[in-house]
């Protein structure tokens, strides 16, 4: 059996490879252009080399100290998930069916992230991945050693019930009920999941003290044609969270990606009393909103629309037109058009565009 120092040294080497993989793959996913898949695959392949092929045999040979056997098993499982993710992406055939390979790769990645996050106490090299750079100096304060608040904290996954779909919730590890906490509701894209999209928001939430509620749609995507179907589900989740945690009702925000952005318009205008602001990203203003627009429903809620010039799902010309319509009616619209972005995930977009805008808004006046 190797010494604990030797064992941790070998694990640290693996961590360094994993950190490089995670950062590279994140950048690829956020800047994905489906016309340039081979280039993205080549970049990822160059980054990881044969790490995932060799790591399992290395871990098998590496016998952990007794007190790290449970960690060793979890770490091995995380590597398997990351390997599945990498393999699925690299072996996906560019073309119309690549989207399915990408989604499955993403789900495997997030399963791996979940395991790594739960084992972060043993993985110091990876700790920087979970935080914004400016929060590094306060890292220890963001990870208290004791849990005395009486409610679950960290990354929590709730199953479906008759009242709501399944959802993922992040509660900062330093949560205390002695104060109220702002909440961001973030809606995944079509064929996505809550336990997938929540990871794009983890760094700012953990670093700055936000609760995250990331719902799963009841169907493969959001009920845009029948908005009440998913809105009832989301409201039930929201009420459940508010019953358990000390939520600042004057600072509840809504954002969504792609179909989630489309649904953010509908949910945000329909339940405007809940939200300080709504931020649809790479979505469209659906005709299902026509009735609400005619009645100027939710007209006092600021909207920040974020869209890429090269979006191939929802063309930017249509988004520009819908922004003009909203402004003509009297809605408060801020528009950020990203000249180099297409239609992809939103890590840095959440961190550099959406959250700063949320934080610029005045808290909602309480009745």
Residue ranges and their predicted role:
Residues 217-219, 283, 338-340:
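Active-site loop/turn elements of alpha/beta-hydrolase fold enzymes
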Residues 175-223, 287, 312:
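Short substrate-entry loop that stabilizes the transition state in hydrolases
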Residues 306, 316-367:
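C-terminal catalytic histidine-bearing segment of alpha/beta-hydrolase fold enzymes
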Residues 242-243, 250-299:
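Primarily recognizes the serine-hydrolase "nucleophile elbow" in alpha/beta-hydrolase
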Residues 195-203, 284-296, 317, 321:
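Alpha-helical scaffolding within the catalytic cores
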Residues 299, 304-307, 311:
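Short beta-strand/loop motif that positions the catalytic acidic residue
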Residues 173-179, 223-258:
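Gly/Ser-rich "nucleophile elbow"/oxyanion-hole loop immediately N-terminal to the catalytic nucleophile
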């Amino acid at each position: 059996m190797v010494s604990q120092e030797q064992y941790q040294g070998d694990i640290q080497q693996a961590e360094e490879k994993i950190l490089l993989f995670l950062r590279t793959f994140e950048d690829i996913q956020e800047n994905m252009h489906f016309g340039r898949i081979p280039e993205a695959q080549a970049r990822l392949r160059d980054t990881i080399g044969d790490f995932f092929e060799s790591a399992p045999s290395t871990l098998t040979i590496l016998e952990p100290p007794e007190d790290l056997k449970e960690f060793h098993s979890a770490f091995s499982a995380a590597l398997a998930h990351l390997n599945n993710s990498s393999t699925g992406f690299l072996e996906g055939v560019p073309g119309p069916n690549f989207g399915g390979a990408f989604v499955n790769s993403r789900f495997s990645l997030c399963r791996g992230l979940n395991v790594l996050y739960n084992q972060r106490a043993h993985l110091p090299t990876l700790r920087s991945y979970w935080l914004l750079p400016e929060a590094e100096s306060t890292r220890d304060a963001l990870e208290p050693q004791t849990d005395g608040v009486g409610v679950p904290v960290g990354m929590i996954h709730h199953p479906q019930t008759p009242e709501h779909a399944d959802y993922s919730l992040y509660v900062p590890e330093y949560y205390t009920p002695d104060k109220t906490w702002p909440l961001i509701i973030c809606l995944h894209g079509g064929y996505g999941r809550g336990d997938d999209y929540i990871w794009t928001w983890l760094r700012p939430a953990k670093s700055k003290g936000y609760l995250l509620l990331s719902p799963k749609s009841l169907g493969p995507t959001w009920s845009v044609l029948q908005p009440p179907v998913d809105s009832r589900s989301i409201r039930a989740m929201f009420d459940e969270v508010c019953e358990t945690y000390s939520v600042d009702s004057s600072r509840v925000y809504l954002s969504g990606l792609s179909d989630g952005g489309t649904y953010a318009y509908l949910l945000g205008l329909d339940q405007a009393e809940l939200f300080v602001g709504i931020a649809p990203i790479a979505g469209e203003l659906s005709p299902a909103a026509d009735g609400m627009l005619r009645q100027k429903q939710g007209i006092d809620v600021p909207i920040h629309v974020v869209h890429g010039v090269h979006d191939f799902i929802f063309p930017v010309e249509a988004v520009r037109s819908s922004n003009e319509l909203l402004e003509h009616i009297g809605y408060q619209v801020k528009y950020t058009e990203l000249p180099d972005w297409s239609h992809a995930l939103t890590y840095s977009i959440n961190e550099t565009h959406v959250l700063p805008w949320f934080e610029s808004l005045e808290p909602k006046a309480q009745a």
